[in-house]
Amino acid sequence: QEERFSRKKHDPSYPKNAIEFVLKYANLKLSEVDQIVFFEKPFLKFERLLETYVAFAPRGFLSFSKAMPIWIKEKLFQKNLLFNKLKQQDSNYKSDQNIFFSDHHLSHASSAFYPSPFEEAVILTADGVGEWATTTVAIGKGSDLEVKKEIHFPHSLGLLYSAFTYFTGFKVNSGEYKLMGLAPYGSPIYEDKIKKIIDIKEDGTFRLDQNYFNYATG
């Protein structure tokens, strides 16, 4: 939520201001925090990227050559980067042993369930893609949260929506809300064509016809 403080949309920088706000609200020092949890598992995401590029090779080589240096620099050493930033923020923060990495969809589900007033709930998460999962169903009971069902990449409602965002001329991972705002003013004239793209099963799962997409190769 750093953008709420920096006023920079999609601010990718280390969330120093957001962390300071939370610590002040809880009347804590950073060195007093028991656990710090990052929202995804970089190594599993890296595994997906490698497996996908290998599966579709030689297509996507240009995307691969651009993505790998960034991942190696910024993602594979994420724990060390986080520790250094946290240490700069609080000189009393001495160890990285309380830094953990959560499954991306479990992070989504946790942020919805634990602040809620419910003791028990079913949590549906659908986004572009986490490590491998694109859609998950989880059960929350008390302090426990368990993922029960998953749909994996490349079959993704989020990526389908981003494909439409791109097709209509908006920026992916930024302009989706504009498309959502425009949607009520449209008519379902392409419904039959869209039904050819996505196959929805009786149990609610789905598959996308990959002949219409190239996001697996960048």
Model-assigned labels for residue ranges:
Residues Q1-G218:
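Short acidic/glycine-rich loops and adjacent helix/strand connectors
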